[in-house]
Amino acid sequence: MVARSRKRRAAPQDIYPTCKIAGNCPADIQNKFENKTIADKILQYGSLGVFFGGLGISSAGGSGGRLGYTPLSGGGGRVIAAAPVRPPITTESVGPLDIVPEVADPGGPTLVSLHELPAETPYVSSTNVTGDGAAEPLPAGHGGSQISDVTSGTSGTVSRTHINNPVFEAPMTGDQDVSDVHVFAHSESSITINQTENTGGELIEMVPLRHPPRSEGDFRETSFSTSTPIPDRSALRSINVASRRYQQVQVENPAFLNRPRELVQFENTFDNPAFVDDEQLSLLFEQDLDTVVATPDPAFQDVVRLSRPSFTQSRAGRVRVSRLGRTLTMQTRSGKAFGPAKHFYYELSSIAEGPEPDILIPESEQETSFTDATSKDTQQEAEVYADGSTLETDTSADENLTLVFSDRGRGQGSHVPIPGKSTIGGPVNIGDSKYYTLNPGETTSFEADVISPVFIFEGNADGTYYLEEPLRKKRRKSIFLLADGSVAVYAE
């Protein structure tokens, strides 16, 4: 026997409208739509003894019933709702009504009597009669007074008004003169306009602004190297470009310094002299990852942004021009593109220190001032010669010379005569003065190998003079302190 397959019936909401008309609805479907199930009957019979409608259960608004919700921990008490406070009404002081003054006397007569006022006579201060002197005849009239208007022949008062409008200024071109307009108004309602040419004033010619002249060596040192310095530090200085985050790329093409755009993309354009592209700013490039585009320099492949240049110094001491580059090499399904960051740099030639200039200074003796013995008032500077320039010259310029020592503190001076060639090597006489003197008049013959003693003359703080310095040896010195403050040293 073959088992019959059970067919699935339609949904209850599709069966009930049809079977209700035919009257053959299944019991379960009819009880469900007509609320006659066992659960519905329990609620219907139970609701007869218990009422839960005021608690807001089921589909009610949840207002908490007629008394509302109360705290669980609070004691039973009545909640008093605060009523709004009515604003006070401002009261004004009320007084008696104002008494209106009476215009007419109630007890007076009804008719008002009229009073005649005297005629007003015009007052004339002075009379000026003009004309030929004939009086005009008056018209004949009947009784009563006749009043005639008398007009004086005096001239009216003239007023002058000069109006300047500070808001409006007339345009001036070239050497045009400004004129003043004067308006004269008379009492006879006549206006006279007088225009006066104003030829005075000073005409200042406009000249271009000139800077004061400067000398060739007048330069002002500043702490910045550009006309508009930027106080912010460079972005590359705050970022460690030597880290592993950036790929180091050294550029050999010198166009990287002033024309970096030519290294990223080909440009079939001509140079426009009216447009100057600022290569000192950040540069942006458009790259499509779907298409592969060749670049002039393979190192700049897929570059979409180049930062502004920054000048740094490498560890080797060379000047380096750096730019940070952003590349896009990969793209996700969501459209997010990313790529490695690169550090492009171009190293300039190192600046070596220049050689120091060789300055040849001829060796010469110390300059000494000499004064001729015949003239003590005139002082002449001696010329400086090299050591070998006077070896073969026979001159007698050093005959009868005097070495002058001056005391600046006391204003005194002493003269020490220096013997000539004929007396060199002779004895030295020590006189009563404070300096050792050499008398050229006294001569004595001696052997050629005999060396004369060496005397050292020391005065004040002006300096020390050594006689026959090449022959001086280390010997014991005797120091003499004189009464005037000078020091004499004798070497044995």
Swiss-Prot record:
InterPro entries, alphabetically? Late_L2
- Name its cellular compartments: Virion; Host nucleus; Host early endosome; Host Golgi apparatus
Q: Does the entry feature the keyword Phosphoprotein, yes or no?
A: yes
Keyword 4Fe-4S found: no
An annotated GO cellular component of this protein is: viral capsid
Q: Which UniProt keywords apply?
A: Capsid protein, Cytoplasmic inwards viral transport, Disulfide bond, DNA-binding, Host endosome, Host Golgi apparatus, Host nucleus, Host-virus interaction, Late protein, Microtubular inwards viral transport, Phosphoprotein, Viral penetration into host nucleus, Virion, Virus entry into host cell
Post-translationally, this protein is described as follows, namely:
Highly phosphorylated.
Where is the segment annotated Disordered?
211-230
Family that this chain belongs to: Belongs to the papillomaviridae L2 protein family.
Function summary: Minor protein of the capsid that localizes along the inner surface of the virion, within the central cavities beneath the L1 pentamers. Plays a role in capsid stabilization through interaction with the major capsid protein L1. Once the virion enters the host cell, L2 escorts the genomic DNA into the nucleus by promoting escape from the endosomal compartments and traffic through the host Golgi network.
Q: How does it assemble?
A: Interacts with major capsid protein L1. Interacts with E2; this interaction inhibits E2 transcriptional activity but not the DNA replication function E2. Interacts with host GADD45GIP1. Interacts with host HSPA8; this interaction is required for L2 nuclear translocation. Interacts with host importins KPNB2 and KPNB3. Forms a complex with importin alpha2-beta1 heterodimers via interaction with the importin alpha2 adapter. Interacts with host DYNLT1; this interaction is essential for virus intracellular transport during entry.
Q: What is this protein called?
A: Minor capsid protein L2
| Source organism | Cottontail rabbit papillomavirus (strain Kansas) (CRPV)
Its organism's taxonomic lineage begins at:
Viruses, Monodnaviria, Shotokuvirae, Cossaviricota, Papovaviricetes
Q: What gene name is listed for this protein?
A: L2
